[in-house]
Amino acid sequence: MSGSYPEEMTRDLSDRLRAVVDALPLPEGMRVLEIGCGPGAAAREVVRRIGDGHVHAIDRSPRAIAQAVAGSAAEISSGRLAFEQVAAEDFTLPAGRPPFDLAFAVRVGALDGRHPEAGRQALSRIAAALTPAGRLMVGDGAAMAELRLPR
């Protein structure tokens, strides 16, 4: 799928992140939560692929969020991308906002087993923010896998 995007649209996306985004089920119009967005490159690419959908990208690092916001002015002003500085285990869906169809994370300690207690809390928070059919895809940068969520 990445071959269908002009070079100028994907220039800030590494091969690793391009492969991650290529592996995600991204029908047009969906709502996506990215956990651990870093400087926002994957979030911007997902926005490009989901038509009139929406991406809400979170990261615990204030510096990462500042970089993401600085590099995403057009996507933010379109209303299709938002960033929030919050840890996965502390995230809550803002009141009145529709739930997400998909959540994804790459190399996030709370979701890859490095921080089990934070992971339990994060999974509960993510499940609460997804539609009943919503999916969570987690990866290590080389492969993505779907995690079962507590419902």
Region spans (language model):
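Conserved SAM-binding loop
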Residues: A68-V69
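Conserved SAM-binding loop of SAM-dependent methyltransferases across substrates and taxa
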Residues: P39-G51
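Conserved SAM-binding strand-loop segment of SAM-dependent methyltransferases
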Residues: S77-E89
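A short SAM/SAH-binding and catalytic strip from SAM-dependent methyltransferases
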Residues: D101-P116
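Conserved SAM/SAH-binding beta-strand->alpha-helix loop
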Residues: S61
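Conserved beta-strand signature within the Rossmann-like core of class I S-adenosyl-L-methionine
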Residues: A133-D140
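A short glycine-rich, Lys/Arg-flanked "PGG" loop and its adjoining helix->strand segment in the class I
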Residues: G119-P132
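A short acidic, Gly/Pro-enriched loop at the edge of an enzyme's catalytic core
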Residues: L93-A103
